């Protein structure tokens, strides 16, 4: 299920009763009710003058056949993973399949605010599963053991999470300036290769 700019989008069935009517369900409502989508969902939108079509597919192994059909028509895949490095192996079948199919892909770390390990540890755990070098575009900002925002290495900006609202732009914390510079340089080097 997706939202666009916080607005709900239409999905093809309501999770609770498996009805087949077209309904509008917000992602937050779906999550709060403990439901999750079990079928491929489609949506499209325009952004900065370009038209995009998205295929949302469940990640469970029981949905692999539907996922394979969706991947065969994809220009790019976004693999959503758990932030725990110990669970990185769950992404291996999908990452290997994407490499074998030649589908460009990016990894999105879900629930980063609940991460127990570091991004470097997660990338180290994932790297053997990918032909291409894995590069972090964002690094988390930690305050008192909690992740409160992130530094975007491409934009050279920091953001603070605000529950229920878009993240706020903040100054890059002084304790992260050296790491930001080193990680940004590494990211650019890897992209150049």
Predicted region positions:
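P-loop NTPase catalytic nucleotide-binding module
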Residues: 2-4, 13, 17-18, 81-193
């Amino acid at each position: 299920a997706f939202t666009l700019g916080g607005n709900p989008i239409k999905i093809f069935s309501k999770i609770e009763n498996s009805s087949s009517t077209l309904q509008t369900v917000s992602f937050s409502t779906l999550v709060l009710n403990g439901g999750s989508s079990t079928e491929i969902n489609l949506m499209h939108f325009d952004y900065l003058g370009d038209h995009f079509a998205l295929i949302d597919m469940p990640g469970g192994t029981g949905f692999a056949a539907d996922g394979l059909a969706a991947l065969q028509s994809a220009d790019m895949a976004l693999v959503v993973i758990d932030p725990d490095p110990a669970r990185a192996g769950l992404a291996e079948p999908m990452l290997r399949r994407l490499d074998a199919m030649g589908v460009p892909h990016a990894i999105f770390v879900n629930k980063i605010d609940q991460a127990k390990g570091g991004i470097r540890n997660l990338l180290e755990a994932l790297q053997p599963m990918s032909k291409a070098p894995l590069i972090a575009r964002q690094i988390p900002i930690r305050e008192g053991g909690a992740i409160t925002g992130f530094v975007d290495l491409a934009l050279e900006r920091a953001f603070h999470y605000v529950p229920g609202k878009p993240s706020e732009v903040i100054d890059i914390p002084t304790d992260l300036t050296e790491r930001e510079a080193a990680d940004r340089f590494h990211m650019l080097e890897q992209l150049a290769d």
